[in-house]
């Protein structure tokens, strides 16, 4: 499954070198990032974590509000992006909004920022510069995102995934 978000320090290029136990009852991912190992293994029982609450929110929105999330990102994708528009959307993201809109902005900004790099300043504000990706462009492949969403619906015996 393709990753739907780029993340610095991701494990996608290391998948063939990572050693994973042949059997396990529950998969724990302390630093989910882009989710390369999780999406590759597709475990039946998993718990994920990350220090970035906005990243965890993104996974929650994809899991719990897939259709509305896709709709929000599609609306953003219709914007003819320029540096000025990028900076305005980055400001909106940093000022805060509802959880669903924040997740949609996060993935939209990730596809348009310099090298897909999620970077924050000392205040904890996202400050990655514009990646000169002008115009309209898709932020995700719907079938891939829906496939990811359905795998996130796997839950442990207590009904928890994230």
What are the residue ranges of the model-derived segments?
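A conserved donor-nucleotide-binding helix/loop in the catalytic core
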Residues: 15
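SAM-dependent nucleic-acid methyltransferase catalytic core
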Residues: 1-12, 21-24, 65-162
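Conserved S-adenosyl-L-methionine
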Residues: 21-78
């Amino acid at each position: 499954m393709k990753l739907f978000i780029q993340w610095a320090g991701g494990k996608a290029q290391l998948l063939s070198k990572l050693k994973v136990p042949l059997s396990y009852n529950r998969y724990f991912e302390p630093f989910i990032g882009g989710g390369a190992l999780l999406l590759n293994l597709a475990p039946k029982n998993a718990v994920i974590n990350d220090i970035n609450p906005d990243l965890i929110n993104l996974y929650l929105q994809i899991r719990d509000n897939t259709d509305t999330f896709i709709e929000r990102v599609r609306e953003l994708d219709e914007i003819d992006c320029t540096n000025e528009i990028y900076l305005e959307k980055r400001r909106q993201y940093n000022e805060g909004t509802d959880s669903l809109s924040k997740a949609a902005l996060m993935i939209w900004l990730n596809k348009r920022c310099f090298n897909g790099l999620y970077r924050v300043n000392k205040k904890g504000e996202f400050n990655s510069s514009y990646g000169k990706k002008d115009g309209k462009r898709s932020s995700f492949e719907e079938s891939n995102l829906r496939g990811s969403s359905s795998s996130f619906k796997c839950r442990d015996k207590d009904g928890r995934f994230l």
